[in-house]
Amino acid sequence: MGRVGLVLGAGGVVGQAYHAGVLAALEHDLGWDPRTAEVIVGTSAGSITGTLLRSGVPASELAAWSVRAPLSTEGALMEQLFGREHPQFDAFDAAQLLRRPLSLPGPQMVRRAVTRPWSFRPVTAAMTLLARGTVDIRDQLTALREVEDQEWPQDPLWICAVRRSDGRRTVFGRPGTPDVPLHLAVASSCAVPGYFAPVKIGNDTYIDGGAHSPTNAAVLRDCGLDLIIVVSSMSAPGRGVVRDIHDASRWHAGRLARREACALRAGGTDVVVFRPGLEEQAVMGDDFMSSATVTDIVQQSFLAAGAYAAKPEVRSLLAGVSC
């Protein structure tokens, strides 16, 4: 078996359900255990899923918890962390958030835009300037802090966040990045701008890594991997009619995911991207913080991922991970 990287993208509560369905399908149909990935990259919801995998929870148990099925001893951590109920959040209304006044950019943001225009992303900058959210995501991760006891998993887990002062992406857990408590890295990666409050770590504050990219798959370039599996719940399958801000967001996420996948392939790495089709998107809806359809999302993504993985052109790429 070659060296496999796993990228778990952003997507809120529905994104975690999508991860569970896709990963359970890979485990069931191919016999591949996502916990064995050489490196796991998690952004926002993906940082939670990645942490659970690195903590020993198998994909089948992620799905079982999501659909309220009985858990094995390996899945007991899910119940310890979250109980048996899906988390409940206020509805996420992107249009309403964008109507709130923006903050003025600080000197670090301006300096970066002037001195490094090739790496400056206007959309990312705009996300950092959104009015601060009021919900403290750290409250939702108290149990994670107690379970992980401040220690990072032994196997590589890279968690992506964005530094609010200058819009720069930070990859916690990657060699060369300052050590931080795991629960704070996850919290910062999940701090959806305008919805959750930014997370302070040391002298800096951070927001959701999805502000830079919904997947951040590009961080695995030049890592010597043979295959990268990307699970991108926020992506649209391709160009289509953009009716509203939700369609625009999916189109933007899909464009970034395709661009990152192309760059990885150009570097000699095979890439397989799982993204929701139209039927899955209909089940997921527009409020990615809603738990109303979690069970349906897991079931739909499980079936769709299995069908996609069975396509000859995809099956040939995944042959190295199947038993």
Residue ranges and their predicted role:
Residues M1-T43, I48-C323:
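Patatin-like phospholipase
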